[in-house]
Amino acid sequence: MNLRPLHDRVIVKRVENETKTASGIVIPDSAAEKPDQGEVLAVGPGKKNDKGELGAMAVKVGDRVLFGKYSGQTVKVDGDELLVMKEEDLFAVVEK
């Protein structure tokens, strides 16, 4: 199933954090924190300004982004857990 977000929303798939520390200690799932990074899978057309014009989105499909641990609404699509959130809930784009 393909999702097309509306307005200034983006669809993000969480990128799992390392389950092992730098010293080699394995972190159990129960102690691991929710990842706060993800890959943008889909981007809406943008938010309308006061004149009714669409503002350009600052992120694009494929961008790796940072967001709050509790940001967005979780949805399950074809067995994958995805996040739907507004662009303003994103903190930054991770540059490679």
UniProtKB/Swiss-Prot annotation:
GO terms for biological process: chaperone cofactor-dependent protein refolding. Signal peptide: none annotated. It comes from the Bacteria. It is found in: Cytoplasm. CDD domains: cpn10 (cd00320). One of its GO terms (molecular function) is protein folding chaperone. InterPro entries: Chaperonin_GroES, Chaperonin_GroES_sf, Chaprnonin_Cpn10_CS, GroES-like_sf. Keywords: Chaperone, Cytoplasm. GO terms for cellular component: cytoplasm. Pfam families: Cpn10. Together with the chaperonin GroEL, plays an essential role in assisting protein folding. The GroEL-GroES system forms a nano-cage that allows encapsulation of the non-native substrate proteins and provides a physical environment optimized to promote and accelerate protein folding. GroES binds to the apical surface of the GroEL ring, thereby capping the opening of the GroEL channel. Belongs to the GroES chaperonin family. HAMAP family: CH10. Heptamer of 7 subunits arranged in a ring. Interacts with the chaperonin GroEL. This is Co-chaperonin GroES.
